[in-house]
């Protein structure tokens, strides 16, 4: 009985340390993988063998590291090299640029690129969701509500849009009473 409490304490502490160790190793592994990919892409760029997708991937790596300026520069290079007949790819690229501008709170530029994405893929729900987020962030609740209604036109069972719509409707009703 006298050994049970110390045993449980040491076991619990060991489990916590094991979880921390696994987390640290997974973080190191993912960083290492991203850095190796970064080196590989930069080598392609130095050898002038990079295409739009390589610059896009490089931008995504910088975006994940929160280096937004470098990400935007690489996304713009990707835009210049991207195949114009790849509508889905262009929509994704424009959406990613818009997302990057959203991260640095440049909402006008973000909306510009989101609108460009919708020109290529009008029913791109991720872009519509991002536009709705910006309208909410800028307190343009009526436009946000319209965007979430538009999402529901394309995907009737979209739980995110339904929840946001219910929330916005409540806020708009409450604001009308004030």
Swiss-Prot record:
One cellular-component annotation, GO: chloroplast
Keyword Repeat: yes
Entries under PROSITE patterns matching the protein: TPR, TPR_REGION
InterPro entries in the record: TPR-like_helical_dom_sf (IPR011990), TPR_rpt (IPR019734)
Annotated compartments: Plastid, Chloroplast
Entry annotated with the keyword Repeat: yes
Residues in the signal sequence: none
Keywords of this entry: Chloroplast, Plastid, Repeat, TPR repeat
Family affiliation: Belongs to the ycf37 family.
Protein name: Uncharacterized protein ycf37
Organism, as annotated: Guillardia theta (Cryptophyte)
Source organism phylogeny: Eukaryota, Cryptophyceae, Pyrenomonadales, Geminigeraceae, Guillardia
Recorded name of the encoding gene: ycf37
